[in-house]
Amino acid sequence: MNDIAIDKEHLHYLEQLSEMYPTIGKASSEIINLQAILNLPKGTEHFVSDVHGEYEAFSHVLKNGSGAVRKKIDDVFGLAMNKADKAALATLIYYPREKMELIKQDEPDMDSWYKTTLYKLIEVCKTVSSKYTRSKVRKALPEEYAYVIEELITEKPEVLNKEAYYESIINTTVELGTAEEFIVVLSELIQRLAVDHLHVLGDIYDRGAGPHLIMDRLCRYHSLDIQWGNHDIIWMGAAAGNPACIATVVRNSIRYGNLDVVEEGYGINMLPLATFALKAYKDDPCTRFVFKVAPSGADNMESDLTVSYTHLRAHETL
């Protein structure tokens, strides 16, 4: 066999690979696996930009995948389901607990509704999982329901009477009283599988009241990348202790009525600053720093600061 010339750079990588795949069989198996993955449809990528701290709107966009979930419902049921029922199913997937509370008020036979709904969710779940390998789907499954969900969404040619097999699993779920929790789990799994990767483009922070909640949500997200915006950089600078960034963050938070982000979101006491401002600038109209929120919001914030200052003065005189 002829000697193959290998430069040092490539040799380093080959040595690393030889530790991961020490035999021809293991290397071949991995090549086959990767080639199979390349032949699967590309996972859905979701782009969101300029979130600006609006947590409720951002959360809703994540739940529906900017229409990706509704499209899957259309793909699965087509003309077999009318628009109203599709919209109701979509809402259930986005907000399962809240929707079920509303259903209970009008539905006389909840057990029947549970069974029908579970069948629908399983069909949607099969479709959204079809882009991925079994291994990837398995990793996305919640541990306590992993086996049952995998049984329901995986084709089993060895099972001759599939309908009876699925029906027995669903009936048992309803009889055990776990149907509601199972519906929540399936709904969240559909949300999870509908979007393979999230791209967040710029300005998580700014005017909205929930950027810290958005960051918490992103920390739990399965796959994402972030392109930071100028407002995000300012908050990073403030966290790092830069005086100019700190002043800008406080100024913006006050002008847009979002001091709760600083005080409740990050636990920073703003009362000393409010006390100083009320003393030092009590006769200054500060026209260059007027509120940009609605007048009622500005009045509420000013009232809160005044009450805090009054309480502080009362405490000092005791």
Annotate the PLM regions.
Residues 77-101, 238-289:
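Extended charged low-complexity segments that act as oligomerization/scaffolding linkers
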Residues 61-67, 214-218, 239-250:
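Short secondary-structure boundary/capping segments
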Residues 310-317:
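Conserved small/polar residues in nucleotide/adenosyl-binding loops
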Residues 6, 19-130, 303:
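N-terminal low-complexity, Ser/Thr- and acidic-residue-enriched intrinsically disordered segments
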Residues 54-55, 206-209, 231-236:
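Active-site environment of divalent metal-dependent phosphoester hydrolases
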Residues 30-42, 187-197, 210-220:
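A short acidic-Thr-Gly-centered motif at the start of a beta-strand
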Residues 102-187:
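Low-complexity, highly charged intrinsically disordered N-terminal segments
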Residues 50, 203, 230:
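Divalent metal-coordination and catalytic microenvironments
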